[in-house]
Amino acid sequence: MLAYISGVGGNARQVFYRSPNLTMLKVCFPNGRRTPPHDHGTWATILLLSGEEKNTLYRRENGRLRRVGEVTLTRGEILPMPTETVHVAECLGGKPTIGLHVYGGDIMGEVPRHMWDPQTLAEHALDWNTYETFAQAASQAPSAP
C-alpha cells in the first residue's frame, strides 16, 4: 500500500518506500510553486518524470547561504545532491512537475533537516507548518533568494 500525503499549498507526496536508510517518494509541485531554501539532512536524487523544475543550489559558508548555481531539469533528467546541498525547487513551464525523489535516510522521520526563511535567509529547524508559510512567501517572490 502506498501512503499519499497532500500539502496545503498543493504539493503532493506519494510514499513508495520508507525505511531508516532509504525513502522513495513521488513528488508533485503545482505550476508556479517554489520551495523555501532547505536541505534534506542526507543525500538526495531527483528524477524528473514530467514538467520542468528549476533548482537553485546553495552552499553554507560562515553561517550564511551562498548561491552556487542553477540546474533546470526536464523529463528524464536526474539531479544528484550530496548531503550538504541546500536548494530551492521551482515548478516552471505552465504545468505541474512530477519527480521521483530518493533519499539516503528516513527524511519523513528521524533525519534532522533545515529550512531558511526566503525573505531573511534565517536558518530554522524544518517543521512542516512553517515550511508551508515559507513556501507561500517564496512562491510570491519574483525569484529564488
Model features per residue range: what roles?
Residues 17-19, 36-38, 62-63:
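Short loop/turn motifs at secondary-structure junctions and domain boundaries
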Residues 36-38, 55-56, 81, 87-93:
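Short beta-strand His + acidic residue motifs that chelate non-heme Fe in jelly-roll/DSBH
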Residues 41-58:
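Glycine- and acidic-residue-biased ligand/ion/polar-headgroup-sensing regions
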Residues 60-87, 121-128:
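Short acidic-glycine-tyrosine-enriched beta hairpin
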